[in-house]
């Protein structure tokens, strides 16, 4: 029996047929099997890491990095604002209280603000209430920044959140966030093996 015969699935839809549907590249015999194994190995490898907020941001698209940078600059434009990273998010404090948090969920930056989400139910902001999660109890206003218009809305919402703080001027320079591969992130402690 030839090696090409070994690659044929036996009756029904086998794993190889499902892989062929995902990887539409036609390759000869043994190479096809190697490509499929490599594809599934890469998928499996990607699931074996717990990624920190910074790791997600570092490996995000330029659009996500730009939106994050704009929101970061908006928050840092107020006197006394300090930020720090935790595993899940970046927290912004001013006057001794938490005013905002930002994280990346999937491919979307998500902003949490110290505003009451119930006051914004039927508004253009489409706020979500995150108060049921203890880590967002102080910043229950959950707002997805999934478009340029939402960046403008974030500016308005941050202005409302920061009313009691002095505006000192917003930087137009976005933070530089160079891409790093998984190996580098692992070495830096920004991702953990599960």
Predicted segments, located by residue:
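Well-ordered alpha/beta subsegment
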Residues: 133-192
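Charge-rich, low-complexity N-terminal segments
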Residues: 2-72
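Generic solvent-exposed, charged/amphipathic alpha-helical segments
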Residues: 72-76, 159
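Short, conserved beta-strand/beta-arch hydrophobic-aromatic motifs that form part
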Residues: 85-141
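Amphipathic alpha-helical interface surfaces
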Residues: 67, 71, 129-132, 154
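Disordered, low-complexity tails and leader-like regions
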Residues: 6, 22-24, 119-123, 172
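A mid-sequence, solvent-exposed acidic-amphipathic segment
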Residues: 76-85
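Short, charged low-complexity intrinsically disordered segments located at boundaries
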Residues: 99-108, 184-194
